[in-house]
């Protein structure tokens, strides 16, 4: 049998994870992978919800974590053992929550979309967790995505509302 958990609005508009209880295997699809995802894809798409992403990871951890011996995902290598799975899911959850919460904190202190990415520093918990460090997705880009989700892409400078086109 399968046990499903909807994860729509995380990596994709329609996403789910599943648990195989007879095998103690949790498939997190692309919700938890061996990298930090982009919250806004460079190719263009709707900004992904970092707060929801963290919530879905935590819900999966609570529902399936104590029964999981192996975590698999769509593109990368597995995570083995309950302790490893637990730590992996906590770090994945925490990086999305950190980007979300700290970006809003910086924005509420008056920073623009161009400033939040540079101001957001890697959290201490990420120093030894290679799967959440900037590789595919990165803090700079994800902070700008969170800012855009809540405040739009406007940087607060009137001159940037209708800039002149680059010269040919």
Feature roles, as predicted:
Residues 148-168:
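Intrinsic disorder at enzyme termini
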């Amino acid at each position: 049998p399968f046990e499903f958990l909807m994860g729509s609005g995380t990596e994709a508009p329609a996403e789910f994870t599943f648990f195989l209880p007879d095998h103690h295997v949790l498939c997190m699809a692309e919700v938890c992978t061996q990298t930090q995802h982009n919250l806004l894809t460079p190719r263009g798409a709707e900004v992904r919800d970092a707060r929801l992403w963290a919530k879905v990871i935590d819900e999966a951890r609570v529902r399936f974590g104590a029964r999981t011996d192996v975590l698999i995902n769509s593109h990368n290598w597995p995570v083995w053992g309950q302790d490893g799975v637990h730590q992996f899911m906590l770090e994945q959850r925490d990086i999305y929550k950190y980007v979300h919460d700290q970006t809003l904190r910086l924005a509420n202190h008056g920073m623009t979309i161009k400033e939040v990415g540079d101001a957001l520093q890697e959290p201490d918990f990420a120093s030894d967790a290679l799967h959440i460090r900037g590789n595919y997705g990165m803090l700079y880009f994800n902070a700008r995505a969170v800012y855009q989700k809540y405040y739009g892409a406007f940087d607060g400078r009137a001159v940037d509302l209708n800039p002149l086109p680059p010269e040919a």
